[in-house]
Amino acid sequence: MALITTGSKFLRALEQEGALAVYAPLEGGYEGRYLRRLRSKGYSALTYSARGLGDPAQFLMDIHGVRPPHLGKQTIGNEAAVGRVEYVLPLVGYPLQNLPANAKGLVLWLLEGHVLSPQELSYFVTLPQAEPRLKVVIEMGGDRGFSWQPLAAVAEAA
């Protein structure tokens, strides 16, 4: 029970800032503990990797088109030579619309955040301001202990 009740400093910082940059020990396990703490406080959580995310504004908040792998099959006729486009729901926008009534909000936890560009980091800083029910946590690298700082400070330094 002590693992669930601790972590209030992290939760306060996340609610105050909206977006945090996290540094966790490389052996892992810490993100699961803090996600469990967030869920116990009433937040829903989504975990994605920042690699291959594409355009964050489109992939996270809008319906967007993707081209599935063609697996050696050619398109014939009126479709483009590169393949058909399939439209998928937004990764964050759709779950955000369908949050349970008793949920405080939605936490987007991104792994491998060191691959994000400064423009993408600044987008993640402004995202919780545009949608107050959304909180963003981005793992930026490793550290000896679990630490965090506002994502705005990391985006300015990048």
Swiss-Prot record:
Its EC number is 7.1.1.-. It is a peripheral membrane protein. One of its GO terms (molecular function) is quinone binding. It is an enzyme of class 7 (translocase). GO terms for cellular component: plasma membrane-derived thylakoid membrane. NDH-1 shuttles electrons from an unknown electron donor, via FMN and iron-sulfur (Fe-S) centers, to quinones in the respiratory and/or the photosynthetic chain. The immediate electron acceptor for the enzyme in this species is believed to be plastoquinone. Couples the redox reaction to proton translocation, and thus conserves the redox energy in a proton gradient. Cyanobacterial NDH-1 also plays a role in inorganic carbon-concentration. NDH-1 can be composed of about 15 different subunits; different subcomplexes with different compositions have been identified which probably have different functions. Belongs to the complex I NdhN subunit family. This is NAD(P)H-quinone oxidoreductase subunit N. It comes from Synechococcus elongatus (strain ATCC 33912 / PCC 7942 / FACHB-805) (Anacystis nidulans R2).
